[in-house]
């Protein structure tokens, strides 16, 4: 099994022992690494030249899937040695997110796109079927995005750990959406900033629903930041203060064995400011009490992180866990002591970047995106 690190793909792996294989989705392909001793050694690049949004390892079939911002899904049936296009039925839509779950004992893979549509495949990506009701919720005509072409996208997909019919997606910018019938019908979850970034149901406490949305573009009365709902999304509570160090909260996860152990990362301000400030000023934070209090993690990390952290992954095993964080500078930070101390295990590969975010922090003269 692989640890998959990408902006819109799998963020949690579990098993009896720690994983020693890492795949990083970047603007220039999937970079593969193998852990030997205390270092992560390069194993080459898969599908070079393609900007990957998402990577998923489907455990029952041992298949790998990668989605790109150039409207392709690639699949590998031999642990990454060979890849082939498998996106028939999706059309010319950018792939922003991938996820998988078991439905009736068989693997089902989901793909979220820009414009915001949701698809699924029951044959390991050989054919895809749309769940069209996602676009039949009230207000879909208001879905948008700050940067051109001003089209919303499905940024995040999550499933109920005990009921595969319950699916949540985050549409940026459109809101958090919920289905209780496997995607046949959808409702929009209100009472939270509709600039939806991520949504997650923790495996060990499915009564909770977590979501992230930036505090940088809404009033103080609107729940935003790192938020929790205990009633399926009917009401939300912000678990981070308005002056939280991370205003543009994005990737996060919950430890599968401890629902109170949370990690979140992101920039101080939104992408529209990065070019002017020449920095995203990103950070990683940890809560041990379900979000009541937070620690900004600094041990071993650069004093100032200019790049944004756009992907995080956790590998949990019996007796421990490791955290990986990928940046728009192509660096990967790593901790195996609960985030107290970090190492930069990979430097200067392709940027780990949602769409064009990395260009906001790149050389002058390039077009800025949001």
Segments from the language model and where they lie:
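Extracellular glycan-interacting surfaces
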Residues: 1-370
